[in-house]
Amino acid sequence: MARPDLHERISSLRKLRVAQERVRVRRQVGRRDGVRLEIDGRWLTGFCSNDYLGLSQQFEVVAALQDAAARDGAGATASHLICGHHTAHETLEREIADWLGYPSALLFGSGFIANLAVQQALLSEEDDVCVQDRLNHASLLDATRLAGCRLRRYPHLDVEGAMRQLKGAPEGAAMLATDGVFSMDGDVAPLRALSLVARMQHALFYVDDAHGVGVLGPQGRGCVADAGLGVAEVPLQLVTLGKALGGYGAVVVGEEALVRHLAETARPYIYTTALPPAQVAATLAAVRLARRDDWRRTRLVELIGAFRDGARKHGFELMASDTPIQPLLCGEEATVMAMSAALEHAGFMVGAIRPPTVPEGKARLRVTLSALHTPQQVQALIEAIVQARDVVSRQPLRASA
C-alpha cells in the first residue's frame, strides 16, 4: 500500500475548506490607538480584542517594558532551569501568587503550553482520566489527548454530568478541568458545585481562568475568588497574561508541591526558553494596576450593562454572559460573515465566530468590551448592528472569508 503524500493531503483539505467557504484570513493591523485599530488603511473601532482592562498600551506598562529591555536585552536567552530565570520572572511569580492568594506560581510561554504542561506532568498513566466541560478551550482538550490519558466530556455546565463521568472512570488518577469563563459564550462555570464533585470523587480540580482573572472577583482575582474558593478547593489554576493583563504568557498558581512538581518534570516548561524579561516587567506593572484600579472593572460592568440593555431593546438574542464577552447569535455562517462585513463597512471590527470553533448553526458575532470603550462607542456599535441586521435580512447570503 502506497504511503499517503502529505502535499496531496493538505491540498485536498484546502480544497474542502474553500468549497465550504471556511478559509481563514489574517487581517494585518497597521497601528493601534486604544480601542481603535488601522486595517487596510482605515481606522476602525475594535470590539474584538481581549484587552479587557485596557492595559496593553498603558503608559506605566509600556515604560516598564522599555526600561527592562534597555537593561536586560530582548530575550531571556535560556530556559528557566539553565540561566533564563531572571529576577523579573521570580518577582512576577510572587506578585501573582500573592494577588490570587496561592502559595506558589510558575510562568509559562502561553496558556496552551501551560495546559499541556499540567496534564503531561500530572496525568502520565494510561488509566488516568481528565473530565472536562464539552465547551472547554481547545488547549485543555488537546492537552489531554497529547498527555495520553483518557478524556471524558460532560454537557456544558452540567454538574451531574461531571459526577457521572468521574464515577464511570474509577481507575487511575483523575482531574476535573473547566474554563472559568467560557471564551465563546462568556458564561461562568459553576465552580462551587464542581469543586464539591471533585472532592467527592477524589479528583484534582483545575480551573483555566484565562478570561476571568483581572475582570471578575475582588481586586480582579478571577472566577475562583468570586466563587469564594481558594487553593483548598482549586489546587491548581491557570492565569493567562495576554487577556485582561494585556501582555503575553501564562502562570499556573497552586499548591507548593504541585507547582514544584511541574517545574521539575513538565517537559513544556523544562525545554522552553523563558519569557523575555522585558515582557515580564511589563506584565508586573499591569498586574499592579489591575490589583489597584477597581475603576476599570466598574466601568466594564457599566459598559456590559449598557450593551446588553441596548441589544435586548432591539430584539437580539443574547447569551447568559455578564462578562466582557458578549456573543450575538446569528445562526448560519453566511449571516454572521455578512453581518461582520457590514459592521466593518460602518467602521467597527467585530469577530465573526463560526464552525468548527462553535457548533453548526451557532455562528455568532463575538463582541468584546474594554474599559477603554466609551458609552458613545457602545451605543454607536448597537446602532450599527441594527443597521447591519436590516441590510443583511434584505439580501441573498453567501459566506466568505
Swiss-Prot record:
<dbReference type="GO" id="GO:0030170">
    <property type="term" value="F:pyridoxal phosphate binding"/>
</dbReference>
<keyword id="KW-0808">Transferase</keyword>
<feature type="binding site">
    <location>
        <position position="24"/>
    </location>
    <ligand>
        <name>substrate</name>
    </ligand>
</feature>
<feature type="binding site">
    <location>
        <begin position="111"/>
        <end position="112"/>
    </location>
    <ligand>
        <name>pyridoxal 5'-phosphate</name>
    </ligand>
</feature>
<feature type="binding site">
    <location>
        <position position="211"/>
    </location>
    <ligand>
        <name>pyridoxal 5'-phosphate</name>
    </ligand>
</feature>
<dbReference type="InterPro" id="IPR015424">
    <property type="entry name" value="PyrdxlP-dep_Trfase"/>
</dbReference>
<keyword id="KW-0093">Biotin biosynthesis</keyword>
<dbReference type="InterPro" id="IPR015421">
    <property type="entry name" value="PyrdxlP-dep_Trfase_major"/>
</dbReference>
<dbReference type="InterPro" id="IPR004839">
    <property type="entry name" value="Aminotransferase_I/II_large"/>
</dbReference>
<dbReference type="GO" id="GO:0008710">
    <property type="term" value="F:8-amino-7-oxononanoate synthase activity"/>
</dbReference>
<dbReference type="InterPro" id="IPR050087">
    <property type="entry name" value="AON_synthase_class-II"/>
</dbReference>
<comment type="similarity">
    <text>Belongs to the class-II pyridoxal-phosphate-dependent aminotransferase family. BioF subfamily.</text>
</comment>
<dbReference type="GO" id="GO:0009102">
    <property type="term" value="P:biotin biosynthetic process"/>
</dbReference>
<feature type="binding site">
    <location>
        <position position="357"/>
    </location>
    <ligand>
        <name>substrate</name>
    </ligand>
</feature>
<comment type="pathway">
    <text>Cofactor biosynthesis; biotin biosynthesis.</text>
</comment>
<dbReference type="Pfam" id="PF00155">
    <property type="entry name" value="Aminotran_1_2"/>
</dbReference>
<keyword id="KW-0663">Pyridoxal phosphate</keyword>
<comment type="subunit">
    <text>Homodimer.</text>
</comment>
<feature type="modified residue" description="N6-(pyridoxal phosphate)lysine">
    <location>
        <position position="243"/>
    </location>
</feature>
<feature type="binding site">
    <location>
        <position position="137"/>
    </location>
    <ligand>
        <name>substrate</name>
    </ligand>
</feature>
<dbReference type="InterPro" id="IPR004723">
    <property type="entry name" value="AONS_Archaea/Proteobacteria"/>
</dbReference>
<dbReference type="InterPro" id="IPR022834">
    <property type="entry name" value="AONS_Proteobacteria"/>
</dbReference>
<comment type="function">
    <text>Catalyzes the decarboxylative condensation of pimeloyl-[acyl-carrier protein] and L-alanine to produce 8-amino-7-oxononanoate (AON), [acyl-carrier protein], and carbon dioxide.</text>
</comment>
<feature type="binding site">
    <location>
        <position position="183"/>
    </location>
    <ligand>
        <name>pyridoxal 5'-phosphate</name>
    </ligand>
</feature>
<feature type="binding site">
    <location>
        <position position="240"/>
    </location>
    <ligand>
        <name>pyridoxal 5'-phosphate</name>
    </ligand>
</feature>
<protein>
    <recommendedName>
        <fullName>8-amino-7-oxononanoate synthase</fullName>
        <ecNumber>2.3.1.47</ecNumber>
    </recommendedName>
</protein>
<dbReference type="InterPro" id="IPR015422">
    <property type="entry name" value="PyrdxlP-dep_Trfase_small"/>
</dbReference>
